[in-house]
Amino acid sequence: MSQPIPSASPALAALIERAVARVRHALPADAPWPEGVEHPLARVALASDFVVDTLARQPALLAHLAQPDPPPLPVPRLDPAQPQEWAAQLRRYRAAASARLVWRDVLGLDDVDATLAGATTLAETCLQCALQALEQQFSTRHGQVIAEDGSVQRLVVFGLGKLGGGELNFSSDVDLVYAYPQAGQSDGARPLAAEEYFARLGQQLARLLDETTADGFSHRVDLRLRPFGSAGRVALSFNGMDQYFQREGRDWERYAWLKARAVAGDIAAGEAWLETLRPFVYRRYLDFTALDGLRDMKAAITAEVAHHARLDDIKRGPGGIREIEFLAQSLQLIRGGREASLRERRLLPALQALVDLGQIDPPTGQALADAYRFLRRVENRLQMLRDAQTHALPQGEPERERIALGLGYAHWQALLEALAPHRTRVAAEFAELLAPRVHATAPDTLADYWRALPEGDAAPLLGIGLHDPNNAHHMLADFAQSSGVRALSDGARTRLDRVMPALLHAAIRATQPDAALRRVLGLLQATLRRTSYLALLDEQPSALARLVDVLSRSALLAERLAAYPLLLDELLDTRISGPLPDRAALHTACVDTLQIDDTEAALRELNERRLALSFRIALATLDGRQQPVDSTQQLAWLAEAVVQTVLQLARRELVAAHGQVPGGAFAIIGYGSLGGLELGFGSDLDLVFLYDHPREVEASDGKRPLEAGRWFARLAQKVMTLLGAETGAGRLYDIDVRLRPDGGKGALVSSLASYRDYQRDRAWTWEHQALVRARAVAGDAALCEAFVQVRRETLTRVRDPALLHEDVRKMRARMRSELDRSDAGRLDLKQGAGGLVDLEFLLQAGVLGQAAQHPALLLACATPALIDALVQVQWLPAESAAPLHHAHATLVEAGLSCTLDRRPRLVVSTPPIRDACQIVAAIADAQQLRFQPGKGA
């Protein structure tokens, strides 16, 4: 007697009893009944007639399943000499392997994720097994397809949908698309052109898997997702696929190919081709033009649910699996071009990536993941019952009882009560997705004015806040009849007509309305070719308002947005107002681009990330969410990470061409603002290059070796070239290497020994001053540490205080006379009296004079740290620390404010500025460093 199932009705208990008896009777007389198998078999019989049928047909399978942890079954070998047996072998294998999946699922050996993965692996195994046998058969009959370049061509089988995502349900069909890399002809006795060869091969593969025989079927095959659907060719070359997606590709196909994966045949070639398809699936910029197509798809889903009243369908019904998939994949399509983590085939990791990026809040993400797992588990059990491709909850009481008890619920109502909250939550989230547009509003007079342009006059612009309405009218009229506007499609022109009055209304309410309008028009002119940005402003009124606000307050950001519209994406990023990335996060964001093999593409991606991160820092500074001194430090960290990444790119290229110098080392030293962690927006980088290598090593070890010194010079030159190279996102940084030994007359790269000798014997005092702020920013750790030692040896030298102060004053006087742009009404924040350079010279003099006694001073490079260090050693009085910090912060803030609004760092000497400069000057005087008065003083 089998052990009864708790709560089972008498009829169900009898059904289970008969099922167990049927399996027992199917065993050969000499086959033992596995010990302890009766109870697990009864539980499985409750959940699946399919498993009972399979065990009745393959009774030897029971011993395999009765193991404590039944392993995968051996894959059948399809004998080329017996093709008539292939179908039966595949079907018996698929039935046995599927029975194992049910067994493990029902007995709790696998969770739903493992069951879905197992069903996927089974489908792939059958595909690969069948294709391998057919390829051998075709090769015998027709030979292999040979392309013009002599390469052998193989069929590529792409799996779409849940097969591609690795989430195949138990009794699912498989969505396949066939392709092949290149055209050609087979080389056998009965040759075929590649197109016919692979079409026949693909059709036979589908038939071998799909046809129902006395042994059932292996897998239902659906080929309708191929280009042109059922009317299209069975197999296309990669070139044909490319042409189709360039000319015919539609939004729903982007959605379908999001999960695509090469699952059989020439998998490597398939995955490589999918990389080329990525720009079709994921647009490079935030893709709000896709929203209309996605809304249409959502409306079709909603209409189908309403029309067919699919309340019991847990896949297509309200709150079902399809709604979760659509929710995740829609957000992936919109943002996946910018966020690599969203280019995920599997649904659950995609949901987590959306949570990590702030596109879904964590509770919602968890609720959707829980609902997805619950629904997929129920779906699998519905299909496991009789191996039927069903998604509908059963209507009959016996089936309901079996499903509920099999899932661990006492009765059907208990299962429904557990299911309902999941579906309700999913339906609510689906309803919110792609909600109807709420457009930005503007007075009707502005809408009428815009529609009338270029006709009409400036009258509607009078008295609404513009300082020069006539000039504004002329700008708007010129824009309205510009070639860019005239070239817009009807849809894009409709969007512009919706957006333009709202932009105009936002501009006139800005702090600088005329400047805001001028900058808005400049940005629109630059972005009209990319209608996705018009769609962004049309779809996101908050982004429109935010954009105009930023444009009105920052000429620099207005310029950058117009030059690099991808930065508009940052305005919509929910992380924009959150904590800024720390040093480690900045480093990770940059070095991740090294995963891109092509240097040009890696450089472009690196520059786009640098632009986005510096834009984020600029917004935080502009909004007052971060202190300017902290922003300059972050900009230096970002530059440091970029230099480290570029060095690796340069080294990668050089090693590939010439090998490496055995035992050699290279380091990049950051001077000036980079070294002092006080970099501005748009600052150049002061760099010095050092190298070292064993004396016995004379050259690199590649096929085209270079003399060691030349190799390092080539590396330094390549770093400079990459940092200054023009990409689609501009250049990374301008580089200044004049602080190297002997300046412009010296070698681009110095050996460690020559650098040490230069600093010891020939460097001027001002060069030692510069060394105070210098630090290693990239390169080999041992050489970076050796530089630290040279810096220590140089700066801890005992100096004559009087001579030191005289040298510092003379150099400051020279710089003042050559560089100070102050006049009677304005102060040069950097070079003026009491400005930032005076403060730097004060601190550098302190370090040079005190480091011999207090070497701990050398741990500091940044101005705030240097102030604290000099107070600590009592060179600066303790009471000067707070005033100096405040003065420094005031001057840095004023300087960044000028830079953000594209003004020279010449400011009217307001009381805060005047006080800051007086503090610096007074403390310098107290240290016998009375610097020459500034111009206009």
From Swiss-Prot:
Region Adenylyl transferase: start-end pairs: 443-937
What EC number(s) is this enzyme filed under? Answer: 2.7.7.89, 2.7.7.42
Query: Could you give a single Gene Ontology term from the biological process aspect?
Result: regulation of glutamine family amino acid metabolic process
InterPro entries reported in the protein's UniProt record:
GlnE, GlnE_rpt_dom, NT_sf, PII_UdlTrfase/GS_AdlTrfase
Protein's job? Involved in the regulation of glutamine synthetase GlnA, a key enzyme in the process to assimilate ammonia. When cellular nitrogen levels are high, the C-terminal adenylyl transferase (AT) inactivates GlnA by covalent transfer of an adenylyl group from ATP to specific tyrosine residue of GlnA, thus reducing its activity. Conversely, when nitrogen levels are low, the N-terminal adenylyl removase (AR) activates GlnA by removing the adenylyl group by phosphorolysis, increasing its activity.
Q: Could you tell me which NCBIfam families the record lists for this protein?
A: PRK11072.1 (NF008292)
- Under what name is this protein listed? Bifunctional glutamine synthetase adenylyltransferase/adenylyl-removing enzyme
Q: Which organism is it from?
A: Xanthomonas campestris pv. campestris (strain ATCC 33913 / DSM 3586 / NCPPB 528 / LMG 568 / P 25)
